[in-house]
Amino acid sequence: MAKKRVTLPKEFNELLTDGNIDQLKAVYNKCELTAHNGRYSLSTALHFGGVPDELVIWLIEQGLDINIPDYYGATPLYRQAILGRDTVKLLLELGADIEKPNNYGDTPLHMAAEFFHPKTVKFLIDKGANVNVENDMGRTPLASVLMVCRGIYIAQTAEIASMLLDAGAKKTSKMKERVEQIGKDFEFHRESIHPDYIEVADKGLAKLYELFDVKPVEKRLTHDGVSPIKLVEGSWEEQYEQLWSFLIPSSGPAKTVQGEVIRIPGRVRDELDRNGGANWDRDYRKMLQAMPHYLSLGSSLSDQELEEIKQVIAQIHSKENDDEASLDRLCQLALAWIKQNPNPIDLKEPSYNR
């Protein structure tokens, strides 16, 4: 008797789409029940989105372990929870382990929450899932959904958070801080969010503020493009933060040169600090190289200061350079120029795309 294959046929996804049960069962005439889609995935048919209920039942009846892990230790229940599919209900009815985590400690409830599936979250809670289980990063399902929450998912996050709290999930001070940050991020990007989502997101945000006793973040005031730009009293850091909120758009370059000389060091700092320079390319270098030109417009900085800027930007993202200090200095020089040039200067289309 010929040895059966350990991998699924290449056309398996197409067979799932067609949904012909006899053809799907016939796959296992030549394949092991544990056949998967590759050694760096190890996803069996039970892990696939769109797997028919009849095939799920048949495979388990034939002896396939309902909790079989893939390459990352994820069970079929875990994968179906990511997708928010009703297959979750079937797998639990057939005996799936509701708490079995992947290799990183995430449970199916973590995934249903992180991928914003309120119905799946409710179902898992009703079936007894532990709402305070922690993954390897020490995050509960509630902490996890707050961590990944962005813009258009605020309403789902609020609904999920409410369910988890009602089921006994514990609140922490870090969660409160995270809700405040969600509010700040939303207000900063409000202008770029599609109008169809605004009302629902606002209601969700109000719910999050209520659930975590957070003072609502004020709506952002932005520059009108024509009025003089005034700096607040305070440290250069406070002045920089004020202008960042006032002049920087949700995405893309600023409308004014004043805004752009604030945006560039901030954008570069984010890439180097948060992203480790993984996406560093010519456009980042072009952004920096544009600074001397921008700061020479209108009432220019001194020749000595412009020369200093050139030296500073030449050293950024080079070996053994203190990028933090270099970017701080760029911010300070940008603020000095803005003080000399309060009247907005329209920004011409830049040569970079960052």
List each language-model region with its residue ranges.
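N-terminal segments that cap or nucleate solenoid repeat domains
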Residues: 2-48, 54-59
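Ankyrin repeat A-helix N-terminal signature
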Residues: 14-19, 44-52, 79-85, 111-117, ...
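Ankyrin-repeat boundary/"N-cap" motif
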Residues: 5-12, 35-48, 69-80, 101-107, ...
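Ankyrin repeat domain, specifically the short helix-to-loop turn at the C-terminus of the second helix
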Residues: 26-33, 57-65, 89-97, 122-130, ...
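Hydrophobic, helix-prone linear segments
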Residues: 26-27, 39-80, 87-93
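Eukaryote-skewed repeat-based solenoidal scaffolds used as protein-protein interaction platforms
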Residues: 82-83, 93-96, 101-106, 111-118, ...
